[in-house]
Regions:
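Metalloprotease/metallohydrolase-associated module, dominated by Zn2+-dependent proteases
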Residues: 2-63, 80-154
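Active-site recognition of the HExxH zinc-binding catalytic motif
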Residues: 67-80
Length: 154
């Protein structure tokens, strides 16, 4: 059972800890739709400096919602870098080209890894629940399965 009051208290703590407040107006929204397949997400309006953190109240895939909360807030913290890099990719590559696809995929994968690493660092230092979620990892192929069927290079 999700303890919404506890998560809302952690939301207040983390918006201050990450120095997002008072620069940004940020709210937390619980998603009650069982068909929503994410654990968390964020909507950002840079013009008005407003953001909405969305958390799955029905069927979250991650065990530690504090980790998810910090992860989504890190996306807001890094959003200026996200926007500049995306603009550079769009201005230097033709949309749909191989270079565009490579740059876009590489950037967003690296951004996601960076957000997650920063989340882990802050969570392990300042989090109330320092246990990392392994929900998505459990659905991935094993190392052996990834290489099963590849030809021997010798």
């Amino acid at each position: 059972m999700i303890q919404k009051e506890k998560i809302e208290s952690l939301f207040d703590k983390w918006t201050m800890k990450l120095r997002l407040i008072p620069d940004w107006d940020i709210t937390l929204q619980w998603i009650e739709d069982p068909s929503w397949n994410k654990t968390g997400d964020i909507k950002i309006d840079c013009t008005d400096k407003k953001a909405i953190v969305l958390l799955n109240a029905v069927s979250p895939k991650q065990e530690n919602l504090e980790e998810v909360l910090v992860h989504e807030l890190m996306h807001l913290k890094l959003y200026p870098l996200d926007q500049v890099t995306e603009a550079l990719i769009q201005s230097n590559f033709e949309e749909g080209s191989n270079g565009y696809k490579l740059a876009y995929h590489g950037f967003f994968e690296t951004l996601e890894q960076t957000v997650e690493e920063l989340t882990k660092c802050f969570l392990l230092e300042f989090g109330e629940n320092k246990n990392l979620s392994f929900g998505r990892c459990g659905t991935q192929k094993t190392f052996t399965e990834l290489y099963d069927g590849l030809n021997n290079l010798e």
